[in-house]
């Protein structure tokens, strides 16, 4: 299962650019995400049936309070089946943007047959 597509589709209602790893545009608001960890779960006959993917979701916003969009992102990810916890909100003085971090995780089917 491609977790990247799950994240992008889940966050589509935000109407913001969503990109894995980095964003190379010039929008004042955008979302990036990266894999923090991935490990096998639910073993049967010594073979994992699932992978648990842990991701960091980064929401960047310039010139506005990030709280409401941060809550929206959390709701959308949760609705899509992710476990979600809220991380810190930092202000980056060099870019003049708020940087919000959310931690998300999801179980997906391991397809070792492919």
Task: Report the location of each language-model feature.
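Long, contiguous binding/interaction regions
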Residues: 1-54, 60-114
């Amino acid at each position: 299962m491609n977790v990247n597509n799950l994240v992008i589709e889940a966050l589509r209602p935000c109407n913001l650019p969503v990109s894995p790893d980095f964003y190379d545009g010039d929008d004042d608001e955008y979302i990036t995400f990266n894999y923090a960890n991935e490990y096998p779960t639910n073993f049967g006959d010594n073979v994992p049936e699932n992978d648990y993917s842990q991701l960091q979701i980064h929401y960047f916003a310039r010139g506005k309070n990030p709280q409401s969009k941060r809550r929206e992102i959390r709701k959308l990810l949760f609705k899509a089946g992710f476990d979600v916890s809220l991380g810190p909100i930092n202000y980056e003085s060099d870019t003049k943007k708020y940087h919000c971090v959310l931690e998300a995780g999801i179980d997906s089917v391991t397809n070792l047959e492919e």
